[in-house]
Every structure is written in C-alpha cells, then in structure tokens.
C-alpha cells in the first residue's frame, strides 16, 4: 500500500480566466488533497503565479502531463517534495549569520539540512565543527578568481545542495560560478549599497549621520548585489550610536533578514520572474 506524500506544485503562466479551476480540478481528478493554495496575478506582465501544497499518492508524470494539456502555451510548472531542503553555506571570517543559521537548523526555526560549510579562510572551522557539520577550506591564495571559483563550485557539487547560501562570504563570484547554480545562490548584504560601497560601510554611515540601517537578502546573478530581492528590513538609529553600535545593530538585521529569506525559499514560496520575486 502506498503511503501519502506531500508535494508543492508551482505554476507560472500567462493569465487567463479559469486557471485556478483547471489546476484544482486536475488535482481532484488525481485524488490529491489541497492542503494550501496561494495565487497572484501580475497585471503589469499578465502573468499568473500559483503555489499549491498537495497531499496524496502521486503519479508525477501523469499529473504534469494533464497540467500541460490544460495550461496555456508558455507555462512553467514544477512539482517537488515538500519538507526539508539541503544547503551548503559559504563563509569568510564573519560569524554572526553563520552562527544564527547553525543554531536555527539545530534547535528550531529552520527545517534545513546543512550539508557542509565551505570557507576561503579557516577562521570559522571550530564553530562549524561544534555542530558536527563538515567544514572545508578552499583557500583563494595563489589562485585567480576563475580558478578559485572552479574549486569552490566543485566542492559544492560534491554535496548536491538545493541552495547555496552566502553567509557574509566576501568574494565576488564569477559569471561562470553563478551559471552553475541559477537561482540557487542566496546572499545577504547591508542595504547601504550603493551609497556606501567598499570597506567599512558602517563607519561611512556613521560619518554621514544616517538614521536607518538595514539589510537585503537576494538571489545572486551576474551583476554585483543586483539579483532579485527576497527580503529586506531596517532599524532606526540616532546620533547616540557609534560606528561600532551601528555595526552590532547591522549584524542583527543581517542575520534576521537572511534566516527569514531562507525560510521562505526553503518552503518553496519564492518565485523568480525577471529580476523580481513573488512570495506566496
């Protein structure tokens, strides 16, 4: 006897009348229970987005074939198991985002398997190994950007992750690296860019007397820090904050935004369309 499974059906297609009925009727025909359903129409682009969480006994190929026959031309649909996803985290030296992900993965807050942590420095090895997670050093010393990214990508591929998370990984990725993991790389950065670029952004912000600081989590594409945005947040600061105070506050925002973004991504709620995201 087959046991019940839970899967997530994600659909992007040109908007038409009756799409929800078509999709849900096919699910009913396959004797699948709809646990949750969310949809959105982008009237500017004429696109329909739908996330449907299903439970039942699946015949994937038949279900997808039936959907293809019912959906308009130019539709994209995917059906994946619900539940735990597998990630590899890339790091350099900063511990705040990594530590937060390790704690939440182990003690609640993120249903995720951290397959490995890979760093271009060895600084965070002891932290990672406390959680019995493999740490790999792939040093950039003596290597070109392309050579180092090739080694990093090969190391990541060995773990077959669903996503690659940059937890304050301070290297600019080559287009070749990004192309190996399309819409699979998630980055966190402070929201000062491009106003405060380069080193010591919090010190630059302090000198300018900023009143808010924040962070942005986004997918990585070929343009530095310009990929589709998943999550953003800010906090208010004032004249009493030193540069060090701003840095501490900024790190708190960064780790919170990254974990919240990752939660949405792992739940298969984030749709990428062009350079935007739709979160259902």
Curated annotation (Swiss-Prot):
Pathway: Purine metabolism; IMP biosynthesis via de novo pathway; formate from 10-formyl-5,6,7,8-tetrahydrofolate: step 1/1. One of its GO terms (biological process) is one-carbon metabolic process. Gene3D superfamilies: 3.30.70.260, Formyl transferase, N-terminal domain. The active site is at residue 225. Keywords: Hydrolase, One-carbon metabolism, Purine biosynthesis. Residues 8-86 form the ACT domain. Its EC number is 3.5.1.10. It comes from the Bacteria. GO terms for molecular function: formyltetrahydrofolate deformylase activity. Transmembrane segments: none annotated. It catalyses: (6R)-10-formyltetrahydrofolate + H2O = (6S)-5,6,7,8-tetrahydrofolate + formate + H(+). Belongs to the PurU family. Catalyzes the hydrolysis of 10-formyltetrahydrofolate (formyl-FH4) to formate and tetrahydrofolate (FH4). This is Formyltetrahydrofolate deformylase.
